[in-house]
């Protein structure tokens, strides 16, 4: 999972946008800030994608404490699988957990190249993996298939060409963190 870095000078903050009043604008700005990548599943956001403004802590949604730091652009399916504040108490079941902006998120959530699974190195990190359903069967298969495609690019064109291609086409790249881990490249 790739860490999301929030911008303290985001237009969302500087213009004082609020949810739900400015929901569409917030979603568009979050998509751009996240380079058109789902904050949870690292899947590409396209014009045809169904995207939600996700409230990481669902208990804050539409309260006075809800703010930019709690909002992420996520694929609708990822949001559905996570559940809501009323859906089977998933939020309460997975406390203690780290959030997607945590400074050492990428060191605490690891990727197993063999199985295609994410795992946390501690309880809080594993709770995030479980809470976000990062090891959903279909998602895991997508990651493995994407790795094969990128491996083919590397075999045909070399690592340097492929890395430069991925950097130039950053908004088209899925599963960035996994590619960084597997191929030892920085995207």
For the regions a protein language model found, what residue spans apply to each?
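Extended charged
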Residues: 1-15, 20-29, 44-47, 62-72, ...
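Cys/His-clustered metal-coordination modules, chiefly Zn-binding fingers
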Residues: 32-39
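Short N-terminal amphipathic alpha-helices
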Residues: 41, 49-54
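Histidine-centered catalytic micro-motifs used for acid/base chemistry in nuclease
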Residues: 52-58, 75
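Coil-to-beta-strand transition motifs
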Residues: 36, 48-49
């Amino acid at each position: 999972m790739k860490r999301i870095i929030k911008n303290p000078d985001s237009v969302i903050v500087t213009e004082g946008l609020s949810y739900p009043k400015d929901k569409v604008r917030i979603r568009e700005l979050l998509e751009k800030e996240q380079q058109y990548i789902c904050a949870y599943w690292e899947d590409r956001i396209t014009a045809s994608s169904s995207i939600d403004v996700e409230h990481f802590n669902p208990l804050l949604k539409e309260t006075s404490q809800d703010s930019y730091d709690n909002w992420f652009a996520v694929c609708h399916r990822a949001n559905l699988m996570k559940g809501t504040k009323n859906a089977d108490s998933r939020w309460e079941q997975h406390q203690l957990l780290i959030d997607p902006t945590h400074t050492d998120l990428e060191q605490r959530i690891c990727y197993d190249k063999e199985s295609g699974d994410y795992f946390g190195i501690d309880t809080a990190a594993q709770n995030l993996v479980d809470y976000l359903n990062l090891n959903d069967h279909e998602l895991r298969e997508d990651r493995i298939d994407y790795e094969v495609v990128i491996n083919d690019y590397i075999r045909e064109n070399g690592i340097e060409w492929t890395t430069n291609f991925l950097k130039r086409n950053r908004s088209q790249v899925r599963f960035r963190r996994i590619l960084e881990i597997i191929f030892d490249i920085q995207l």
